[in-house]
Amino acid sequence: RTLILIPTETEAALLRAACPDAPVRIAGVGMAAAAAATARIIAEEHPDRLILAGIAGASDRSVAVCEVVAVAGERIAELPGKYAVRYAADFIPAGLRTVESNTTNRTGVAASGTQIENMEGAAFLAVCRAFGVPGAEVRAVSNYTDDPRSAWRIEESAEKLAKTIIRILPDYE
């Protein structure tokens, strides 16, 4: 069975409203919360695969605000050189553009060849790898990283994310 992990209840509520039976779990915000939740969910629920779904900021303006993308790989932005391991997704949902992402604790960290940034992805993929559970990541871009917070389109991007998850979920049932 496939479970969907979503960082916040706000992001999850739209998916639950549209699809009450969706197998949604809350991952929490940030690397520590996402790692702990992912490990607990794997240990307690023994899923066949996991999909992390949430919003992200884009550093590359070729990625549109409100576009939904699949993350091919994640890096922890603040780690130096040899410690900057790339965590690859185990599968890519069909029909989505793929991007590289930085996992960071704050917005606007140097992009280093990535198109988007978020706060949970590398931790999620690292735990999936450690437990041998296939993991994928889907993100809806809510803003550009240099936009003021007042310009972020969180609700609209979360709505697009929910519609995309509903569309791809049958592929993994």
Which residues make up each language-model segment?
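Extreme N-terminal starter segment of soluble prokaryotic enzymes
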Residues: 1-3
